[in-house]
Design a protein with these regions (language model features):
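A glycine-rich, hydrophobic loop/mini-helix early in the fold
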Residues: 32-64
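A short, polar/proline- and glycine-enriched secondary-structure boundary/capping micro-motif
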Residues: 25-27, 55-60, 133
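Nudix hydrolase/Nudix homology domain
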Residues: 58, 99-181
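Acidic, metal-coordinating catalytic segment for phosphate/diphosphate chemistry
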Residues: 1-34, 38-40
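The catalytic Nudix box helix
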Residues: 45-46, 63-96
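Short loop segments at secondary-structure junctions
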Residues: 10, 39-42, 50, 114-119, ...
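Short, solvent-exposed loop/turn elements at beta->coil junctions and helix N-caps
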Residues: 20-24, 96-102
Length: 181
């Protein structure tokens, strides 16, 4: 049984937990983390979700996403999820989320990180992930169009790539999103 800590709308702990799969009570929130790992070519590591997984089964997704468990913060939850799902031990000690999405019942922290991994050597968690590979910005947008990638807003994918390329939410004239030719 997986337990999640609950927070109020200002992200203050409520000293309450909920069981994964239960409905989030009105006025309470739990933490979710997403990680986008980018390589030196500006490609994102993407994962293919298992066909039997609940929610977005048999679809491609960003590097990973998952809920933090009781006693974890976003950094420790991101570390655990990355180790569990892909077998990558990444040091999140000094990491901060690049952005937080506030959605009904959740605070969703997105980490944009560097990584040079060979997808063929990853230890994908068989209950969650069937495979992983690198993909560029334009390829991910095409995969969304083809209905094989979770249907994120394309402008959101644009923003993730731009934020990684610039290291900021603000554009800089000397840095552009790496589109394939």
């Amino acid at each position: 049984m997986e337990l999640w800590d609950l927070y109020d709308r200002d992200r203050k702990p409520l000293d309450k937990t909920m069981v994964r799969g239960d409905e989030v009570a009105p006025g309470t929130y739990h933490d979710v983390v997403h990680i986008c790992m980018f390589n030196h070519k500006g490609e994102m590591l993407i994962q293919h979700r298992q066909p039997f997984k609940d929610g977005w089964s048999d679809m491609w997704d960003i590097t990973l996403g998952g809920s933090t468990q009781t006693g974890e913060n976003s950094r420790t939850g991101a570390h655990r999820e990355l180790c569990e799902e892909l077998g990558i031990d990444y040091d999140f000690t000094n990491a901060r989320p690049a952005l937080t999405i506030n959605a009904p019942g959740i605070f969703d922290d997105f980490f944009l990180i560097d990584g040079e991994v060979d997808p063929g050597t990853l230890r994908c968690q068989p209950e969650e992930v069937s495979e992983a590979r690198w993909a560029g910005h334009d390829e991910i947008l095409s995969m969304i169009d083809d209905g094989i990638f979770i249907p994120y807003h394309k402008c959101f994918i644009d923003m993730l790539f731009a934020m990684y390329a610039t290291g900021s939410m603000r554009s800089r004239p000397d840095t552009t999103v790496p589109h394939e030719k």
